[in-house]
Curated annotation (Swiss-Prot):
Gene assigned in the entry: queF
Protein name: NADPH-dependent 7-cyano-7-deazaguanine reductase
Organism of origin: Salmonella typhimurium (strain LT2 / SGSC1412 / ATCC 700720)
Active site: C190 (thioimide intermediate), D197 (proton donor)
Record keyword Cytoplasm present: yes
Highest classification ranks of the organism: Bacteria, Pseudomonadati, Pseudomonadota, Gammaproteobacteria, Enterobacterales
Subunit details: Homodimer.
């Protein structure tokens, strides 16, 4: 259980509550969650963040009416900057997008600008939005995370409670290595509903070699952990940086979609360009 799971800032969220679906534009449906909720317990404040990054959202169920009432469909790509005051709560995002369904917009650009304006206001930070026509995305292959997968290890695990203990003494030797490690076994749970969130994670670092068994045990320990996607990625970044002390570190997770949305947060303290192709489970 997260230390802030019952924080009053979460009381007003529609997440975990019965809600009515609206199909006419309603910006009031969007809800933000302060990033400080999980950053404060980690000792992170806006002026001392050890990383940069973004939350990348893919919007698969986006539709509206053109000026003549003809339905339009698109796939949206949203990038929410890590410096924003709030992250966007995903159920509220879904409800907000549903409110476009029977709303007329003159142009695609009007839709894009509306999304960008509303998301920036909710997040209190920088947000960029792109809309793709379906034929732009046809024929795109399923992507894969570059790196060495650490999942196929002959180990026994019987503890699924979150702990950083596995990262203690997880580095060895004085030689500096540079490697990219991948796991598809990341599973955490929604902070409010405790529904499972499934993801793949890519960890790229330069520093003393990290023990792969200990790293995998640490990642598996998220299995009963309740936090939002973005919060898990920041926790993983902070824990690896704290215990393993790499010179450079990038952490990037791509989660399976829910409600027509997938969330793909990344955090890095070096030059890092996230690949945005959807993975096999997305």
């Amino acid at each position: 259980m997260s230390s802030y799971e019952n924080h009053q800032a979460l009381d007003g969220l529609t997440l975990g509550k019965s809600t009515d679906y609206r199909d006419n534009y309603d910006v009031s449906l969007l809800q933000g969650v302060p990033r400080s909720l999980n950053r404060d317990p980690l000792g992170l404040t806006a002026d001392n963040l050890p990383f940069h990054g973004a939350d990348i959202w893919t919007l698969y169920e986006l539709s509206w009416l053109n000026s003549q009432g003809l339905p339009q469909v698109a796939v949206g790509h949203v990038e929410l900057d890590y410096t924003s005051v709030n992250l966007i709560e995903s159920k509220s995002f879904k409800l907000y997008l549903n409110s476009f369904n029977q709303t007329r917009f003159d142009t695609w650009e009007t839709v894009r600008q509306t999304l960008e304006r509303d998301l920036r206001a909710c997040a209190q930070g920088n947000v960029s939005v792109r809309l793709h026509r379906l034929d732009e995305l046809e024929g795109q292959p399923v992507a894969h995370f570059h790196g060495t997968c650490i999942d196929d290890q002959d180990i026994s695990i019987d503890n699924y409670q979150f702990t950083t203990d596995y990262l203690q003494h997880a580095v060895s030797g004085e030689k500096q290595v540079e490697e990219t490690l991948v796991s598809h076994l990341l599973k955490s749970n929604c902070l409010i509903t405790h529904q499972p969130d499934w993801g793949s994670i890519q960890i790229q670092y330069r520093g003393r070699k990290i023990d792969r068994e200990k790293l995998l045990r640490y990642l598996v320990s998220f299995r009963h952990h309740n936090e939002f996607h973005e919060q898990c990625v920041e926790r993983i970044f902070n824990d690896i940086l704290r215990f393993c002390q790499p010179e450079t570190l990038s952490v990037y997770a791509r989660y399976t979609r829910r409600g027509g949305l997938d969330i793909n947060p990344w955090r890095s303290n070096t030059d890092f360009v996230p690949a945005t192709g959807r993975l096999a489970r997305q």
